[in-house]
Amino acid sequence: MRTMINTLIAASLSASLVALPVMAEDEKIQLWDKMNEYTVELEDGLLTISRIKTPPALIKGFLQPMVPAEGVTPVGEIDIIEMIGKEDSMLVDMRMKDHVLQLGTIPGSVNIPYTEVAMNMDQFGCAQQGEGWNCDGVTTKVYAFCNSSTCPQSPNGIRAMIREGYPAELIYYYRGGYQDWTIHGLTTVEGEL
C-alpha cells in the first residue's frame, strides 16, 4: 500500500514539474509599452527578461515609468507615511471605486478615480472657468497612487491633472501603490463611498 501511494505521489510530482514550464510560457504578461519580453546582451550571451503570472503579479497592467509625466516627483512608503495628515498635502487613491471598497485603501486617502479626475479638479483647489479649470495659485501637494507598479490608472489620472492645468511640480507619484503598501504590512483602512 505504501509503495503504491509513493508511486502515485512521485507520478503526480513528475506531471506537475513537466507542466510547469508550459504553464509559465502560456502565462506571459506585458512588461511595458506593448512588449512581452526584453532582451539584453551580457558578457556570456543574450538574456531575455519576461513576466509570468505569479500570485504577486496577478494585478493586470504593465510596468509604469518612475516618472509618469515631466515634473512629477516619484515617492515611496516613507514619503507617504510622513505626508499623511499634513494640511498642505492630499493623498489621492485613483483606483476605481470597486477596488477601494473591495480591498481597502491607505489611511488618509481620498478616492477620486482616474476617470473622474478631470471633472473634479476643484478637489485640488482649481476653480472652474468656462469649460475648463483655472489652477493658478494652487499650492496643494497631490500624492497619487493606484494598484501597483503595473497599474496605469494613477499615471493616466496624473496626466489628466496636468492637461487640465495642475502644476506637475506639485504632483507626487507613489508608483508601488496599494500592492507595495500591503506587501510591507502597512496599515490599511476600509474604503468608503
Regions found by a protein language model. Name each.
Residues M1-I9:
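Bacterial N-terminal signal peptides that target proteins for export
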Residues A19-P21:
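N-terminal signal peptide c-region/cleavage motif recognized by signal peptidases
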Residues M23-L103:
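Flexible, polar/low-complexity N-terminal or interdomain linker segments that lie immediately upstream
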Residues V67-A144, G191:
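Positively charged, proline/Ser/Thr-rich regional signature most characteristic
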Residues Q102-T105, F124, P155-I158, H184-G185:
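Short, solvent-exposed loop/turn and secondary-structure capping segments
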Residues C126-W181:
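Catalytic cysteine-centered active loop of the rhodanese-like fold, especially the PTP/DSP P-loop
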Residues H184-L193:
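Active-site neighborhoods of enzymes that stabilize oxyanions during catalysis
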